[in-house]
Swiss-Prot record:
It is found in: Cytoplasm. This is FAD assembly factor SdhE. It comes from Pseudomonas aeruginosa (strain ATCC 15692 / DSM 22644 / CIP 104116 / JCM 14847 / LMG 12228 / 1C / PRS 101 / PAO1). An FAD assembly protein, which accelerates covalent attachment of the cofactor into other proteins. Plays an essential role in the assembly of succinate dehydrogenase (SDH, respiratory complex II), an enzyme complex that is a component of both the tricarboxylic acid cycle and the electron transport chain, and which couples the oxidation of succinate to fumarate with the reduction of ubiquinone (coenzyme Q) to ubiquinol. Required for flavinylation (covalent attachment of FAD) of the flavoprotein subunit SdhA of SDH and other flavinylated proteins as well. Gene3D superfamilies: Flavinator of succinate dehydrogenase. SUPFAM superfamilies: YgfY-like (SSF109910). Belongs to the SdhE FAD assembly factor family. It comes from the Bacteria. Keywords: Chaperone, Cytoplasm.
Length: 84
């Protein structure tokens, strides 16, 4: 489980300055990240290291990350906002 300092740091790293990313990443880190297992938390931190334009394309479904870990995290975030 994430400690409060880590959550605050991730919150600020999730605020990208691009509204489309902010509305996906900030609620995810606030509501979902604390309950993720250690592997998925690491995947989310890895996602935050990516370029904004790459993430924008993935979240707008214009492409997928080549990395399987990133692909899993993108799908998890999209599934949260696009229910069946």
């Amino acid at each position: 489980m994430a400690d409060e300092t880590e959550l605050k740091r991730l919150y600020w790293h999730s605020r990208r300055g691009m509204l489309e990313l902010d509305v996906l990443l900030v609620p995810f880190v606030q509501e979902v990240y604390p309950g993720l297992d250690a592997e998925d938390q690491a995947r989310f931190r890895k996602l935050l290291e990516c370029e904004d334009q790459d993430m924008f394309g993935w979240f707008m479904q214009r492409g997928e990350p080549e990395d399987a870990d990133l692909r899993r995290m993108v799908r998890m975030i999209l599934d949260r906002v696009q229910p069946d």
